[in-house]
Amino acid sequence: MSTNAIAKRYAKALVQLGSEAGSVDSFNAELTRFSALLTDSRDLSAVFANPAYGIESKREVMKELVAKLQLSPMISNLLMLLLERGRISVLPQISESYGAFADELSGVIRPTLSSGLPLEASQIEEIRSALAKSTGKKVELKVEVDPSLIGGVVTKIGGKVFDGSVRTQLARIQDILQKG
């Protein structure tokens, strides 16, 4: 089974447990925090990945981290389970999948809006409102400036891309002219 499929299984189960406990958001924050720690600290990742360190040593390190970060018992149990099964390296994917499932559960989408020039707050709000109206979900928009677009905007929602950039329009015109 692929690591992505494994990550999704753990994430889906944890979202269900979090939903029952009313802790979806706090679990998400804890997972994100621990995952970032694991990703940012090469030494920590090396300890958990190195078979020379016994499982007891790894458990002690994990217990100390859980205590310092004041993680909930549910997240603590998940981390110990991943450690026992040799899957702690999958935690970043679990965290990412958890975030996606949690957003789906709460009716949130997180599109990315790229524009050739910086947009004014009123323009961003207008786009956010239009996306919320068309999707029926709460929109948390990530705005980026990409000068290569020349002008216009590109919106990415999940796997879909809505490209209204000048760069793409020019490429289409060039393609039409070349084909004659």
Curated annotation (Swiss-Prot):
Keyword Cell membrane: yes
SUPFAM superfamilies: N-terminal domain of the delta subunit of the F1F0-ATP synthase
Short name of any one Pfam family annotated for the protein: OSCP
InterPro entries per record: ATP_synth_OSCP/delta_N_sf, ATPase_OSCP/dsu
Membrane topology term: Peripheral membrane protein
Keyword Protein transport: no
Keywords attached to this entry: ATP synthesis, Cell inner membrane, Cell membrane, CF(1), Hydrogen ion transport, Ion transport, Membrane, Transport
Family matches, as Gene3D superfamilies: N-terminal domain of the delta subunit of the F1F0-ATP synthase
Subcellular location: Cell inner membrane
GO molecular function, one term: proton-transporting ATP synthase activity, rotational mechanism
Source domain of life: Bacteria
Principal subcellular localisation of the protein: membrane
One GO location term (cellular component): proton-transporting ATP synthase complex
Subunit structure: F-type ATPases have 2 components, F(1) - the catalytic core - and F(0) - the membrane proton channel. F(1) has five subunits: alpha(3), beta(3), gamma(1), delta(1), epsilon(1). F(0) has three main subunits: a(1), b(2) and c(10-14). The alpha and beta chains form an alternating ring which encloses part of the gamma chain. F(1) is attached to F(0) by a central stalk formed by the gamma and epsilon chains, while a peripheral stalk is formed by the delta and b chains.
Role noted for this protein: F(1)F(0) ATP synthase produces ATP from ADP in the presence of a proton or sodium gradient. F-type ATPases consist of two structural domains, F(1) containing the extramembraneous catalytic core and F(0) containing the membrane proton channel, linked together by a central stalk and a peripheral stalk. During catalysis, ATP synthesis in the catalytic domain of F(1) is coupled via a rotary mechanism of the central stalk subunits to proton translocation. This protein is part of the stalk that links CF(0) to CF(1). It either transmits conformational changes from CF(0) to CF(1) or is implicated in proton conduction.
Similarity remark: Belongs to the ATPase delta chain family.
PANTHER family: ATP SYNTHASE DELTA CHAIN (PTHR11910)
UniProt name for this protein: ATP synthase subunit delta
